[in-house]
């Protein structure tokens, strides 16, 4: 849904990923809500297997997220070259579960888990794209503070939704 660009944070001297809401979607309330939901979801998550959010804002009418730049390839791209070995599968699966476990413990359900939303980096697998995430109550989160998503068709990829 968003456009992602590689950028340089000159203040902190690091490469970052900047995700913007395209101008043709910025007037769409549903697209804006989804973009904001992604920011809220990942802002509460700090885990080595989840892409880190550094900043969120709006400049010149453009909504943006500044995130950790992930070098590597998506699991989808990797699988196009063939299956993972047993060892790779266990390592990747464990890392994905660790990231999901953190998200779930924090009350965030990803809802769009698929190989294209998992980045394989030198340090391990990282979950990305929480645009369809849903907040759910946990014992640490009062239900009254959560915004639930709209009813209707299910979200996510048809094969995994």
Language model features with spans:
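Conserved ATP-binding/catalytic core of the eukaryotic-like protein kinase fold
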Residues: 1-161
